[in-house]
């Protein structure tokens, strides 16, 4: 059980959050339709509270929690004694206590296990969407419940508590802005905004309207500062115009909404002609702005003043003379009067301590952080003015998750995506990159389309390896539905839950999509020079445009040549591109190269060794076989497999060089074969920067290649014999190479890779 919880803690918490609106709907239907006063919500959230306490104490064994939990228990005991001595209706008062202290207990517990889970903003957004949907549909169909029992107009859909639902929608409004800000899909964005506006305007309550305008105001401030700082006046103007259009639209439809009707009704009740007359009298301000909360505050203050000293210290509870007292609906005062000086101290000492720990390490580096801080401000402000935020379990849970979005975990979370781990250059390079990450600083996840391949067992043991399959079902509709479901599931639970994500397999659409969902700090790895893969600009652009490469933060190339070719077509993306070549494990290469193999080379022949995938679309291995045919002093070993192995074997027979060309197939350890070589040969039409170059340099082997490439540190022309792709020219050059000096040079690859690892860490930490 504990192992299961540890593995799925993020998903379990996320499911609780997503189920919350459904549970609240069941509660609303029970109370309003069947007159059954059974609150599913309370039971559901108490189960979650117990689960979180259990997990923090017994699964993750957080001993730091023993002291604050003891403080809570001691206070609860003194509070219960006070209720027994001076009050009545013990059960109702205990129920009130649980509701109020739900927030600090959940906050405390989740904060101390924050390093073990990550909740997606999309999870919160999904919960908000369900709340909006369960109000919007009944409102349109005219079958929902009324927000107010008398006088005022408003519809609450299938929910029961207007204050709590308003609070949830209000504090999640900035989270909705984050999702909309990032979304590239216009139609869903417009539909969501319209549904949101209809709901908050037809509910009839003030709180969501205030939250909307507050969020818009903060957004405008952010856009102004960003636009002026970056001198990007065009985008600034477009953004502000969009907000003005939104505000203008709200102004047009406002007179037809329940919110506006309620303002008119309230003014008529008070005998006023306009809103400005409200501010002429304190009583009117209290009635219109605070909904008489200040009057309730005075009444509760009188009860508190008359209470015994014990209750002043530990709280007067929630009943008086056998009847439930009216809450002030200003959370800070409700906590103080209901739980006394000691209860208030315990609640806020722990809450403010954790909040301070979180805020001292946060920054305002981007719009998302601005919006999360906006949600935090709304939680603080609305708790004071409207209540039902930190004293209502349904809103408390959402509030805690929002605040925890600001926390920093001990380790940054990195995600790499790939096709599979079958033997290949890209796959080996990915393994080596994972081996060069500092796991004291980073928690790394590798998601594969197919969790298979000979290299799977070589993945660093610290890496979490997962599989998200791409359906290839013959039924196109079923295939699309399955893939859409898997993408949606990933989006809901893992949207922006990583600090860095990298699409390592350039050609994979699935990897491309998952990478962009997982983080806002994204990278796209380009391992080949696609100028040679595609014959013209249109096809080249189609490849990169279909992957929406401009949406990435970083575009990483393994060679300068492939980077420059890319910039020839996309000069506007210059600030995004950089060159960072692949990693190799030099110690492993040298050690494994010493392993004994049965293969022996032909006496008095120069040995050429090729290592790679046998795919004629790029490798053009016939050139190497032709060299052996024309130059009798050469033999060729071919290490690898692929779709064109049969073609190459047939060509070998046609050239009658079977005695000097040997196909070894895939070798998990190719290095003993490379160690026996005189030359490592590559005769490709195109490559990025082949890992084989680095392996050959490590083994002090001469290189013969058709690819004169360079990376962030090495220009291969200084280390290799460059030959022509034209076979006639190539054969002449090969003949000359035989009589040349060895061209290999020693280079400290380990030193280079340490510098390269630092550059990667800079990307991870952005």
Residue ranges with predicted function:
Residues 1-58, 75-86, 138, 381:
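N-terminal signal-anchor transmembrane segment
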Residues 45-48, 69-80, 89-112, 122:
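Aromatic-anchored transmembrane helix interface
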Residues 121-146, 160-225:
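Alpha-helical transmembrane segments of multi-pass inner-membrane proteins
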Residues 156, 284-339:
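Long extracytoplasmic/lumenal interhelical loops at the membrane interface
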Residues 186, 225-228, 232-233, 338-380:
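Hydrophobic transmembrane alpha-helices and their immediate junctions
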Residues 202, 223-281, 306-307:
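A membrane-periplasm/extracellular boundary helix in multi-pass inner-membrane enzymes
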Residues 371-380, 388-410:
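Transmembrane alpha-helices of multi-pass inner-membrane enzymes
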Residues 666, 685:
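Aromatic "clamp/platform" in nucleotide-sugar-dependent glycosyltransferases that forms part
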């Amino acid at each position: 059980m504990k192992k299961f919880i540890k593995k799925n803690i993020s998903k379990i918490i996320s499911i609780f959050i997503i189920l919350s609106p459904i549970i609240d709907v069941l509660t609303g239907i029970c109370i309003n339709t069947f007159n059954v006063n059974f609150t599913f919500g309370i039971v559901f959230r108490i189960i979650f509270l117990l689960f979180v306490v259990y997990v923090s104490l017994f699964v993750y064994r957080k001993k730091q929690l023993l002291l604050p939990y003891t403080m809570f228990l001691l206070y609860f005991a003194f509070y219960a004694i006070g209720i027994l001595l001076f009050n009545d209706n013990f059960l109702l008062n205990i129920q009130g206590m649980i509701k109020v202290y739900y927030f600090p207990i959940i906050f405390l517990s989740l904060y101390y296990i924050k390093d073990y889970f990550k909740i997606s903003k999309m999870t919160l957004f999904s919960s908000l969407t369900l709340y909006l949907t369960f109000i919007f549909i009944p409102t349109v169909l005219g079958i929902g419940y009324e927000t107010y029992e008398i006088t005022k107009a408003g519809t609450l859909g299938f929910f029961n508590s207007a204050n709590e639902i308003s609070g949830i929608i209000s504090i999640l409004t900035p989270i909705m802005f984050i999702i909309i800000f990032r979304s590239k899909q216009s139609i869903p964005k417009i539909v969501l905004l319209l549904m949101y506006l209809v709901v908050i305007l037809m509910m009839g309550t003030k709180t969501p309207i205030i939250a909307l305008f507050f969020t818009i105001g903060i957004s405008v401030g952010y856009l102004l500062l960003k636009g002026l700082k970056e001198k990007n006046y065009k985008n600034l103007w477009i953004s502000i115009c969009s907000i003005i259009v939104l505000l203008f639209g709200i102004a047009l439809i406002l007179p037809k909404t329940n919110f506006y009707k309620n303002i008119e009704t309230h003014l008529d009740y008070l005998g006023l002609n306009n809103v400005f007359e409200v501010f002429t009298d304190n009583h009117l301000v209290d009635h219109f702005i605070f909904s008489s909360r200040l009057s309730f505050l005075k009444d509760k203050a009188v009860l508190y003043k008359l209470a015994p000293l014990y209750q002043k210290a530990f709280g007067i509870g929630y009943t008086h003379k056998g009847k439930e007292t009216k809450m002030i609906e200003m959370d800070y005062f409700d906590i103080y009067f209901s739980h006394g000086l000691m209860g208030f101290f315990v609640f806020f000492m722990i809450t403010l301590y954790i909040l301070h720990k979180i805020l001292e390490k946060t920054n305002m580096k981007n719009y998302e952080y601005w919006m999360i801080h906006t949600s935090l401000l709304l939680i603080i402000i609305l708790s004071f003015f409207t209540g039902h935020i930190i004293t209502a379990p349904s809103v408390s849970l959402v509030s805690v998750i929002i605040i925890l979005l600001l926390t920093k975990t001990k380790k940054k979370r990195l995600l790499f995506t790939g096709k599979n781990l079958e033997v290949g250059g890209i796959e080996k390079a990915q393994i080596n990159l994972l081996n060069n990450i500092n796991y004291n600083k980073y928690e790394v996840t590798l998601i594969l389309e197919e969790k298979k391949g000979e290299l799977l067992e070589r993945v660093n043991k610290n890496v979490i390896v997962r599989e998200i399959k791409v359906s290839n079902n013959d039924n196109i509709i079923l295939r699309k539905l399955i893939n859409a479901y898997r993408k949606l599931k990933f989006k809901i639970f893992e949207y922006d839950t990583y600090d860095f994500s990298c699409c390592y397999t350039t050609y994979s659409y699935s990897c491309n999509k998952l990478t962009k969902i997982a983080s806002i700090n994204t990278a796209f790895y380009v391992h080949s020079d696609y100028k040679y893969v595609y014959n013209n600009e249109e096809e080249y652009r189609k490849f990169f445009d279909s992957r929406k490469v401009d949406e990435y933060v970083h575009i990483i190339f393994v060679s300068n040549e492939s980077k420059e070719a890319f910039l020839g077509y996309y000069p506007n993306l210059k600030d995004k591109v950089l060159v960072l070549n692949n990693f190799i494990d030099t110690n492993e290469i040298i050690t494994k190269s010493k392993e004994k193999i049965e293969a022996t080379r032909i006496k008095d022949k120069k040995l050429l060794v090729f290592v790679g995938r046998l795919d004629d679309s790029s490798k053009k291995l016939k050139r190497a076989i032709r060299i052996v045919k024309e130059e009798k002093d050469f033999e060729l070993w071919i290490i690898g497999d692929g779709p064109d192995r049969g073609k190459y074997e047939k060509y070998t027979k046609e050239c009658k060089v079977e005695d000097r060309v040997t196909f070894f197939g895939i070798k998990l350890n190719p290095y003993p074969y490379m160690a026996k070589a005189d030359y490592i040969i590559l005769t490709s039409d195109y490559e990025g920067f082949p890992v084989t170059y680095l392996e050959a340099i490590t083994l002090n082997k001469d290189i013969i290649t058709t690819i004169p490439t360079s990376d962030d540190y090495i220009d291969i022309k200084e280390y290799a014999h460059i030959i022509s792709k034209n076979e006639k020219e190539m054969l002449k050059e090969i003949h000359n190479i035989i009589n040349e000096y060895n061209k290999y040079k020693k280079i400290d690859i380990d030193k280079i890779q340490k510098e390269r690892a630092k550059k990667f860490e800079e990307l991870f930490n952005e």
